[in-house]
């Protein structure tokens, strides 16, 4: 299977890494990918999910209040929790 990356910086970085390590271009890319994958092992969706939820909280907190009534009042319940 062939991998064709047409990105000048990717090419430059791969060549620089290969030159520093004495590896072929393919070896340098494979090793870099293996090392990156090894660093991500054990990571779960917790970190991205936490960041996503924090962003949602920030967006919700920034929303204007359009109705000053309490949630119970909006839903139609009285102070005893019964429909009013």
Swiss-Prot record:
Matching InterPro entries: VapB-like (IPR011660)
Disrupted gene: phenotype observed: The vapB-vapC operon is not essential; cells grow faster than wild-type on rich and minimal glycerol-containing medium. The operon deletion mutants die faster than wild-type under potassium-limiting conditions, which is prevented by overexpression of vapB. The vapB antitoxin gene can be disrupted without causing death, however despite elevated vapC transcription, no VapC protein could be detected, suggesting that RNA processing and translational coupling are important in VapC expression.
Coiled coil regions, renumbered to chain: none
Keywords carried by this UniProt record: DNA-binding, Repressor, Toxin-antitoxin system, Transcription, Transcription regulation
Gene Ontology MF annotations: DNA binding
Superkingdom to which the source organism belongs: Bacteria
Induction data: Expression is low but constitutive, and repressed by VapB-VapC. Member of the vapB-vapC operon.
Known role: Antitoxin component of a type II toxin-antitoxin (TA) system. Upon overexpression neutralizes the effect of overexpressed cognate toxin VapC. Overexpression alone prevents cells from entering a nonculturable dormant state, probably as it binds endogenous VapC. The TA system acts as a post-transcriptional regulator of carbon metabolism; in M.smegmatis 3 TA systems (VapB-VapC, MazE-MazF and Phd-Doc) may be involved in monitoring the nutritional supply and physiological state of the cell, linking catabolic with anabolic reactions. Translation of vapC mRNA requires VapB.
Quaternary state and interactors: Forms a complex with cognate toxin VapC.
The protein's name in its UniProt record: Antitoxin VapB
């Amino acid at each position: 299977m062939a991998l064709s990356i047409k990105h000048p910086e990717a090419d430059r970085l791969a060549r620089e890494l290969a030159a520093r390590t004495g590896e072929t271009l393919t070896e340098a890319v494979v090793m870099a990918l293996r090392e990156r994958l090894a660093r991500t092992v054990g990571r779960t969706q917790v970190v991205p999910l936490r960041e996503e939820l924090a962003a949602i909280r920030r967006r919700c907190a920034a929303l204007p209040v359009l109705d000053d009534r309490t949630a119970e009042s909006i839903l139609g319940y009285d102070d005893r929790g019964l429909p009013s």
